[in-house]
A protein has these predicted regions:
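Middle-to-C-terminal accessory/interaction subdomains
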Residues: 43, 54-56, 87, 101, ...
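Internal "kinase-insert"/substrate-recognition segments embedded within catalytic cores
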Residues: 109-115, 122-124, 128-132, 146-150, ...
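Residue-level detector of functionally pivotal "anchor" positions at catalytic/ligand-binding pockets or at interdomain
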Residues: 416-439
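Glycine-centered tight-turn motifs at strand-turn-strand junctions
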Residues: 444-458
Length: 473
């Protein structure tokens, strides 16, 4: 009997220990319900209260909630709702790896289309973790004259009475007259005349619903998520699959003088997209958050963009970003083939001359204007989430500006040149410019007064000179 009592006692102690450990683990994984940190008072504040103060735990299921926006006396910002009469919205989680962090990103859907802090009316918005990369990347989208680039506004957020820090309230990517302004194709469309346009898709690297997957080459697949339309008929699904098989086939054509891929893809938009990824040194540019859209018309093509989820690796560039190693194994799609086409390289050069250096130099003042005023809010955010307090707004601004300067100067010296360049007549305006010599990797290795001078000073090898492949013996 004594042995039985001792056994029961031991089991009880063990269970108590398990419960204690489990509760401790749970508490450690959940941020405190009430933060000891409060708003900085330097930015508008977005107050959100879910029904019954229910926690937001799902990326799929919206919770009903109410909101109000307090401008905090900032000129030009309109208040929305009041404490006594808040406005309706729905809220859920969003993101892939970002959702795993302590500070969560959110997707919100307002009760009606509303203009917030000067941004055009819409129901759909995102609350994103603020980074200097977002500030720089989205402004570069405007500088590069992309078809449409999301806007954002910094806000501090109080969720269910708890201060959760600094966020960027950001326009989400949707087909809408104020966003991706193209024809909106209906779900379950079967009319073949209407299926060929009104598409918004994303080259993705995560398994999800609403996707098709086709072989890109002998080594990896190409996965596309269709955002709009979202619920496809068999006819829509077949058209989209056939379309991207055809696009992929033309891009991977062994004949890199072919123009077949240009019948599907807008070359200029792809060149602008490429330049932006290089200036940012964003290794995710061609494998995740790589959006394409297509309008409905007889001559419509796939437009690269909008841009989203931009990072900057802040490293010394030694090659094009899509060729440089990163710590994860996702594969960049298409760009390794596209960069071999002469039409693409020429478009890159034309656009670069349009933006470099004057337009690109505008980014540095913009970064200071946007990032430095966030200092107090960023400090409170770091305290709230126990992040490094040394990451001041000034440090963040200097870091991204220094990275952009390095990337811009590197790219200016390494504009891509196709080894399959056509023997086209050099335009009159270019005849008096220095003769630039490139190796087969597309790197400029020198400038000379003439082609003859270049050839007399080069070692044995194969070079690209005046858009011609020349072998020096």
């Amino acid at each position: 009997m004594k042995k039985i009592r001792n056994f029961i006692k031991d089991i009880g102690c063990l269970l108590s220990l398990v419960i204690l450990i489990s509760c401790t683990d749970i508490e450690a994984s959940i941020p405190p319900s009430q933060s000891v940190v409060s708003i900085s008072g330097t930015l508008p504040v977005l107050y959100i209260d879910t029904e019954n103060h229910s926690p937001i735990v799902s990326k799929e299921v919206y919770l009903n909630a109410f909101y109000r926006l307090d401008p905090m006396g900032i000129e030009g910002i309109e208040a929305l709702g009041t404490k006594d009469e808040p406005l309706p919205l729905q809220i859920r989680g969003r993101g892939h790896s970002s959702w795993k962090g302590a500070k969560k990103p959110y997707k919100i859907k307002l009760g009606q289309k509303t203009s917030i802090m000067g941004m055009p009316k819409n129901k759909h918005w995102a609350l994103l973790k603020p980074t200097e990369n977002t500030v720089a990347g989205l402004q570069l989208g405007h500088i590069m004259n992309m078809a449409w680039t999301p806007s954002f506004r910094p806000v501090e957020v109080v969720l269910n009475g708890d201060y959760i820090g600094l966020y960027f309230l950001t326009e989400t990517i949707r087909i809408d007259e104020n966003r991706v302004n193209i024809y909106k194709q209906q779900d379950q469309e079967t009319n073949p005349d209407l299926i060929s346009g009104g598409w918004l898709v994303e080259v993705d690297n995560y398994r999800d619903e609403c996707q098709i997957t086709i072989p890109e080459n002998n080594q990896w697949n190409l996965t596309l998520r269709y955002h709009s339309p979202e619920n496809l008929s068999n006819a829509q699904l077949q058209w989209l699959t056939d379309e991207f098989k055809a696009i992929n086939s033309t891009i991977y054509s062994p004949d890199k003088t072919s123009t077949a891929w240009e019948e599907y893809i807008d070359v200029e938009s792809m060149a602008r997209f490429f330049i932006l990824q290089e200036v940012m040194d964003n290794p995710d540019g061609f494998h995740g958050s790589f959006y394409l859209h297509k309008d409905l018309s007889n001559n419509s093509k796939w437009i690269a963009g909008p841009i989203w989820d931009l990072v900057c690796y802040n490293r010394d560039k030694s090659d094009y970003t899509f060729k440089m190693k990163v710590h994860y194994g996702f594969t960049p799609h298409w760009i390794g083939e596209i960069i071999q086409y002469d039409s693409f390289c020429k478009s890159v050069k034309t656009i670069w001359e349009e933006v470099y250096p004057n337009k690109l130099n505008e980014i540095f003042g913009y970064i200071d204007d946007m990032v430095l005023p966030l200092d107090a809010a960023w400090r409170n955010d770091c305290e709230r989430w126990n992040e490094d307090p040394s990451q001041t707004a000034s440090l963040r601004a200097d870091r991204i500006k220094n990275a952009l300067r390095r990337n811009i100067e590197w790219f200016d010296k390494h504009l891509p040149v196709s080894q399959y360049a056509s023997l086209s007549i050099i335009p009159e305006a270019e005849k008096n410019t220095p003769t630039r010599v490139f190796n087969l990797q597309g790197f400029c290795i020198g400038e000379f007064e003439s082609e003859d001078q270049a050839m007399s000073n080069l070692r044995k090898g194969i070079y690209i000179i005046n858009n011609k492949k020349i072998k020096i013996k």
